[in-house]
Amino acid sequence: MRIDYHNKEIINKIYTHDAVFKGFDYDYENNLIQFEMVEGYYKKRFKFIFHNVFGFKMASCDFWGKCLRTDTWHTADENEIAEELTEIKEKKRGKSEDGKLLESKSRLNSVEECVESTLYFISGDSLTIACEYIDFEEIRLAE
């Protein structure tokens, strides 16, 4: 299933509670983040691929003790990471010899809206990713 800005509310309806997070892979060259989670009670595997990643942040403090299980996955109403990056982009624009601002060459320019979502863990930690779109797959495991 493809999730983008226009259908991002789907994220709030996907039940990932107690799925075990297996770590993530960030492919810098292709701007991808991918990971899988396995949920034992309902016997499901979840596959996530975040495309055209603009930024991500993670809290990894084990606030309530170490735990790889997830609590929830939610989308944000406001794209904090994208807004922060847009501010940085504007500050970093150079000026031409006549004092005019140069055009930004940022990948942010190529996307109308991005989708930002946060995966919350039982430990109190979180992983927030801002990207163009997400490919999400829910697979039923054999009994």
Task: Tell where the protein language model's regions lie, with residue ranges.
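Surface-exposed, interaction-prone regions used to assemble/regulate multi-protein complexes
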Residues: 1-143
